[in-house]
């Protein structure tokens, strides 16, 4: 069975890859997993390995032409510390000029951090625009057929389901 390190190197051909991977492995706390077979990883560990491979492929130092990163539910299976680490990596890529497109079911994270949103239902875009104008209690209540409300906590919007 393939170990984590070999899986990550499959996605990188540049000789500088080890340097780029080193920071990612530290950020995602994967250094001690490198020799472990992929089949022995937990869901969260496997998610972090796949994210490390994706982030390494788009790393501006290794791929100056890379401009778009597409992530499908990147926070799935991650604890809050790892979610924060992934969020910080995404912010770093955005600052480097990479467009990051991510699917998410976490409405509050999306509301606080997304520049723009495509709200989908049954595989179709039903609304698009700035997160604050799309992720409204009215629109979400209509879409999910449950009552939403928006609160403010420490100056940040918080979507909740009404009791």
Task: Report residues per predicted region.
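Conserved ABC ATPase signature
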Residues: 37-41
